[in-house]
């Protein structure tokens, strides 16, 4: 199914989300410029996103995405080419995440665009422990990152040190833990009951 199918199912029909697709946009710089690591972030990922937003502005009416009339687009979702650093990409690729562009955001069509989430286009094919090829990613990471826009936290060991991070979660049984990778991302886990309650579903 699609991301729309996932959210419709998890909300018992309450949340009927549709995605409008714009692009693709060719970036003027290479992966390393945008994705090289700095402490707790990628170097110029927000420059990448702002460049993409400006490139699609002429063909996109951003006012359509202000769902509550507050002058701000609720969120935008970016899918960037290639692998992500969380799954097969090297340190020069972008880590899938949810964040804001800046303290002020970007103004397009009179709307502030600020909250965003992003994930990679592809996932790796491994052979002998090495990435030998890629194929299209499933919906799992998209659903996981978009769920942060809905207010859900990560439910896995976010410092990867066995400390529990924000929480050990339920592993493959929970989208917000490692369940986004089930079936190569094509069969992501459901939300837990607590997560549905958190969102109001």
Where are these regions (language model features)?
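Extracellular hydrolytic enzyme modules, especially secreted metalloproteases
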Residues: 75, 81-201
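Active-site-proximal segments of metallohydrolase catalytic domains
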Residues: 1-111
